Swiss-Prot record:
Keywords in alphabetical order: Developmental protein, DNA-binding, Metal-binding, Nucleus, Repeat, Transcription, Transcription regulation, Zinc
DNA-binding region: 267-331, 481-546
Ranges of biased composition (kind: Basic and acidic residues): 578-589
Region of interest (Disordered), ranges: 197-276, 324-384, 416-453, 537-599
GO biological-process terms attached to the record: establishment of cell polarity; longitudinal axis specification; pollen development; regulation of DNA-templated transcription
Domain of life: Eukaryota
Residues that hold Zn(2+) according to the record: C298, C303, H326, H328, C512, C517, H541, H543
GO molecular function: DNA-binding transcription factor activity; metal ion binding; transcription cis-regulatory region binding
Protein name as catalogued: Probable WRKY transcription factor 2
Subcellular location(s) of the protein: Nucleus
GO cellular-component term (any): nucleus
SMART domains: WRKY
Amino acid sequence: MAGFDENVAVMGEWVPRSPSPGTLFSSAIGEEKSSKRVLERELSLNHGQVIGLEEDTSSNHNKDSSQSNVFRGGLSERIAARAGFNAPRLNTENIRTNTDFSIDSNLRSPCLTISSPGLSPATLLESPVFLSNPLAQPSPTTGKFPFLPGVNGNALSSEKAKDEFFDDIGASFSFHPVSRSSSSFFQGTTEMMSVDYGNYNNRSSSHQSAEEVKPGSENIESSNLYGIETDNQNGQNKTSDVTTNTSLETVDHQEEEEEQRRGDSMAGGAPAEDGYNWRKYGQKLVKGSEYPRSYYKCTNPNCQVKKKVERSREGHITEIIYKGAHNHLKPPPNRRSGMQVDGTEQVEQQQQQRDSAATWVSCNNTQQQGGSNENNVEEGSTRFEYGNQSGSIQAQTGGQYESGDPVVVVDASSTFSNDEDEDDRGTHGSVSLGYDGGGGGGGGEGDESESKRRKLEAFAAEMSGSTRAIREPRVVVQTTSDVDILDDGYRWRKYGQKVVKGNPNPRSYYKCTAPGCTVRKHVERASHDLKSVITTYEGKHNHDVPAARNSSHGGGGDSGNGNSGGSAAVSHHYHNGHHSEPPRGRFDRQVTTNNQSPFSRPFSFQPHLGPPSGFSFGLGQTGLVNLSMPGLAYGQGKMPGLPHPYMTQPVGMSEAMMQRGMEPKVEPVSDSGQSVYNQIMSRLPQI
């Protein structure tokens, strides 16, 4: 406020924009002298009540009247001269101008703080006491004084009467703000009054009218309005401010909790209600959002409708994609659950079993690839085969299918679990979702996974058959050999291999070829000793050891189709190097039967050569090495043993045959490995 004298208070510089209240008051009463004294007393009273000065009314009156002719140079003189009247001045003699009010909070500030741009200091002098305001209430400060034009000024000359008059006014004083649209004064202070309650007003979008303000809170509002505190109002204002702030904080806290509950229900609860019951069967992480994409399925047993729920970064639902159409009516409201998280109802369990069984059937002759490109599962006509050489395959899972986008691995027919591999996430009879959930995804996700795991344990037993136990015995055999494949008396089919962490040698997976047998094994070399072969067997065979090893009559799928009973009635004999045969594949076999032996084979015999010794090649096998039978006459039913080409020990006739569909492999016989494995398996209880 440049240009103001430093000893002049702010109130001294206020200039009313309208004619002086003293002029109006003198014209109403008719006696200038008495009206001036009343006006000075009224201004002194108003200043003491509004501005917060504690000076006595009588002392203020005496000092103001004695110093009414003292003017200081400044902006007020120029404005007063221009307006043509003398503005009432404020006594600043007892005001400390050099006191720092910010240091001592008990000191009273005589200045008026105005923060609203629409409020002018001159409007404060436009008191409704001296103006005709129909909207003002009839009170000593907001209405008109009971002064009539004919009132004698001597009636107010008595000091006792005047003291009693103003004492009554001070005792019954209360600030009643009029309607905010009635005057410019309250229009300009609307923003100031709503500062402390801005947060509450913004949420509730409601404004408190002047009639709803209680008298007990009017002093608080007026003191906060002017930014000044008096001694008698200091404690009351502080207490009221604390109470008001506490109540507002309570309201804010309640509303924040309400909004948080709404947000949590939208983020982790049921999606938008559409009238149907849904069961969550999977979720998947989405790039750019910490909330996963959720997948739901209708809980009706005959309904195949699914939906996908996308969420924003804040957890709000942004998109719901439906797949299919409902073939049933909406369930009653009392049976709607929004979303069945744990799936405790029997209907959901039956539906899940039907879906899983249908998935088993539909997965045949298909090839699926997981989201991480680590598992490449090749499925045969009636069984699953794992064939990924570079990634980590889940050897304990019986199949992998994809329902929509989430990757769900169902362990229903497998009993092979690999504890050495940290990458294998599948467990016996459990559901492993592609989304790990960051350590469980919270308490709800852990309970949900546990519930699904318990349900699928029973389902795995049903799918695998009553003759299989959920937890199969495990046998680990470690031998020393130069070859990876050890002969243990059973026939195995390799269905995959993988690279194991910390071991440069791959791990190979095999499955017993006997129908109905689910025994599996994996073979790997030790990382510290390349000659040490570790073979781990999972499960127990439900059949006897095959009669012969490395034979084709019982291997693969031939063991159960009755070829041993003489399925081929026509035999081709080879005599003196002459033969006649239809074209066939490289590894096809020609079986010759006679009346005495169920197993025989076309071999090249020269009757005039006598008992042959050594080896010869079968005419019917191109590029394959076959064994001759020394001392065997043509047509002889029982044949003696012949020396093994490698171990020089007697073997049976069926040893000379190869399995159908298998490549020729050199498999050394390990009596120690076979005997150890057979001894261990013989100790296990029969199934």
